Structures are given as structure tokens and as C-alpha cells.
Amino acid sequence: MVKRVAGLRHLILLLCLMMVAVIGVSSNLTLMPEASYQSVSDHTQYQLEPEQRLTPQALIEGQYSDDWQRVGEAINFGYTTDAYWYRVRLENPTGSRSERLLEVDYPLLDHIEFYEVRKGKVRDQAITGDQHPVSSRPMRHRTFVFPVAMPANGSTDVYLRVTTAGSHQVPLALWKPDAFYEANEKDMVGRSMFYGMLVIIVIFNGFLYLVLREKSYLYYVLTNATLLVLMASLHGVAFQFLYPEQPEVNERVTLISSALITLFFSLFARTFLGIDERMRVANWLFRGLVYASSVNVIGSVFLSYDVSTRASVALAVLVSLAMLSVGLVMAAKGDRAARYFMAAWILMLVGVMVWLANLIGLLPASFWTQH
């Protein structure tokens, strides 16, 4: 019996050692020479910074080695102002020096500290974020891109410290430079087409409003114009090209457009569906949403980023749910305008709900949840 217990203990110890070994290996990212793109997040470790400010040297020396945890598939902690440290070891198995681009594909992070470490020493570092001018970025891009070099048959450790007042998500990817530039060109073409489509919608419906003088066209124009500004801000494009050295302007544009979109969307839905004439309770609901959105617009001019974004997210959830509920009820009653409205807007409303769930950390960061 004693031998069996001892044998069981040895087996458990062996399994634990194997698990530790597997975790240690999987936390390193080995470069694949032929791969143009590799996901980094699932090879990354993180730790929450305690009350005292940590230094990169303390982490490099292993003073807090027991506090590192595995990230998993995606880095998304929702709305938090806490500081997080991230690290990943990039291993180069080839006999030649390799250069890659590490991209943090989320343009709304306030402060990012980047440290490139080899043999226990910081070889390169950068401090950037959307609270810093675009010129602070190692590469002038709408997201945050850091060049990383790996010696032949060697490794490089990357440390990141991230703080933000908004949604804390850090999608990490490693690119070959040529592949990144090619993907960026295609990305900008797609975004330009999207922005151009919104401009055409605004101009066309603006002319319709001037001819017909119907308020629904005016609110539709204002909704799409605000959507254009908001998406360009959220994607980091407006900051990159319009006011790259004025992060405070970029912040206010994002906050004000986030507040305005719920106001104009509520006015458009209320007018287009004729809610004030057909549904008394729904009319009170939408009037309340319009008043609340108006107050939020005023607050977005001077309130902090944290408070204003949370208010805008809460209102966006309420407006989306109200539109879906009222639209479906009116469509079920046979209202033709409601059927047209739901056919045109239901996918967008569902998409908004998915995107909001991503912002607050309920869904992981991905292309589909961010776009």
C-alpha cells in the first residue's frame, strides 16, 4: 500500500513537471521563417502592476517571476485603469539575424512602454500611445508598430507596459516587414472605400433633404457624417493624418462623436418610424434617450475620457436595444416603414451590440468583434 502511494506521488510529481515544461515552452514564440504573420497573444504572459511602480529592470532580473500568468487566446480586460505588464520571448532558430514588426492592433490605448531585451539588457525602448503625439511612435502608423531584431540562433524578450482609460485590449501580432506593408496598403484601400461610401451617402441624402425638407433625411445625414468621424477616430486614421501632434484634440473628437452618434441615431429612428404618432410609450422612451444623449454630448466636451466613454457605451446599449425592440414590434404589426428600417439596420444594430460586448470585455478582441 505504501509503495502504491509513493508511486502515485511520483506519478503526480512527474505530471506536474511535464505541465510546467509544456507551459514554459508554449510561452515562447518560435519564428517560422516562411510565415509572414504570427499571432503573439497566445504566447504572452502578463501581470497586474501592484501599487508601487515596477521597473523593467526589476522584471528582467526576475524579482516578480511568480506573478506572471498566461494570457490565453486574446488580451482583453475590458474597462480598467490598472497597469498591466506583458512579456513574450521571441526565438530565432535560423542561422541568420531576423527582423520583425510587432504590432499592437488597437489604436485607443493611452500609454504603451516598449522594451526590447537581449541577454538581460534593454537594447531598445519606446514610450507612445494615443495620449502621445504620433511622432512618438517608432513607425508612423494608425496602430502601434515596434521593430524587433532577433540574433541568429538566439532570442529577444519583449516587455510591454500598458495603461488606458478606455477598453484594455492588446492584440499582438508579429509581421515580416514586407508582408506588413502589403497588408497595410490593402487595409487602407478597404478603409478608404468605406469612408468614401459614407461620404457619398451624406452628400446624396443631403441633396434629398434640401429638396424634400423631411427631417428624417437630415437626421440620416447627421448620423452618417458622425459615423464617418467616429470610425476614422476609432481606427486611428484621423489621428494619423489630421492632427497627429495633438492627442488632446484626438481624444475630444472621439468622445464627442461617440456621444453625437447616439443622439442623431435616436432622432433618426424616432422620425423615420413616426414613433411620436404611433406608439406613445415608445415615444416617451425615445424622448428620454434623446434628452440623455444631449446631456452626454455636453458632458463629452469636458468630462474625463473614462466617464464619458462609459456613459456613451451605456447609452449606445440602451439605444440599440430600444431600436431593436420597437422596430420588431412595429414590423410585427405590419408597419411597412418599420420593416424597411429593420431590414436595413438590424445587422448594424447587432454588430454594434457585439462591438460593445468586446469593449467591456465580454467578447475577445478579434477582427469581427472590432469591426
Residue ranges and their predicted role:
Residues 25-190:
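Soluble non-transmembrane domains of integral membrane proteins
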Residues 229-271, 275-371:
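Interfacial "cap-and-anchor" motif at the non-cytosolic start of specific transmembrane alpha-helices
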Residues 2-12:
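Bacterial N-terminal signal peptides that target proteins for export
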Residues 19-24:
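N-terminal signal peptide c-region/cleavage motif recognized by signal peptidases
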Residues 201-226, 275:
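Juxtamembrane interface at the cytosolic side of transmembrane helices
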Residues 181-211, 310-330:
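First transmembrane helix
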Residues 111-115, 218, 223-232:
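Carboxylate/His-rich catalytic cores and anion/metal-binding grooves
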